[in-house]
Amino acid sequence: VGSEMCIRDSFKIAEGCSNRCGSCIIPKLRGKYRSRTMEHVLAEARQLADSGVKELIVIAQDITRYGTDLNGEHQLAALLRELCKLDFHWIRLHYLYPDDITDELIDTIAQEEKIVPYLDIPIQHCNDDILKAMNRRDTKESIRKVFHDLRARIPGLVLRTSIIAGLPGEGEKEFEELCDFLREEKIERAGVFPFSPEEGTKAATMEHVPMEEAQRRTELLVDVQSDIIDEYNESVLGDVREVLCEGWSEE
């Protein structure tokens, strides 16, 4: 038991982003993706472990791309294996893009007990035309395959995603497709946001769904997600789970 600052820490392994999603301004603000060298990452991680950090939250705009700008190879799995040798209790991963989740990475997550089986994988949408318009490299079926592979190989996995309601090109048909996808894949956690155009992005130049309609769809998606989480919560009633105590209160 200790203070929150020494118990858990967000640990950035890269800066910037090279994904160029059509609705996102981050690449223009922060520049292209730049991985920190493994030597520097591990040196800082050792200091955090020695200081008493028990949960290390590995973050970047896209941690799955780690290392590809250094030598052209995905190095996240190798980095995680090294981090798991240090004195952390849990290692949590934010954020993974589905098209760069390799078999080696899945095996590493499944095999390393310190890696929390909770993966945050933002998909934005599932409709192929919308994904293509937003410069996403995924398709609905490629996303579905990644989710199925992860669930088949990682026991007790919980998935979280981020979804944008009312993206350009989303009509009622595409919206219902998104609702159905959520129901079918039973994604346990989801952050749902109405589309809001950002100046300087491709999406801002496209025809928009009216904001009030985007908000209505957001609320409907939240309802869908509430049903999914209720079902999940009922499925784990009676389970005994390990928790990390960050502090205590007189109350």
Feature names for model-found ranges:
Residues 2-7:
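Short, small-residue-biased leader/transition segments that mark boundaries at the very start
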Residues 8-39:
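Canonical Radical SAM [4Fe-4S] cluster-binding loop centered on the CxxxCxxC motif
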Residues 41, 76, 143, 175-178, ...:
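Aromatic/hydrophobic pocket-lining residues that form the small-molecule binding cavity
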Residues 50-172:
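Conserved SAM/AdoMet-binding glycine-rich loop
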Residues 153, 173, 177-221:
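C-terminal, non-catalytic macromolecule-binding modules
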Residues 197, 205-251:
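Terminal RNA-binding accessory module
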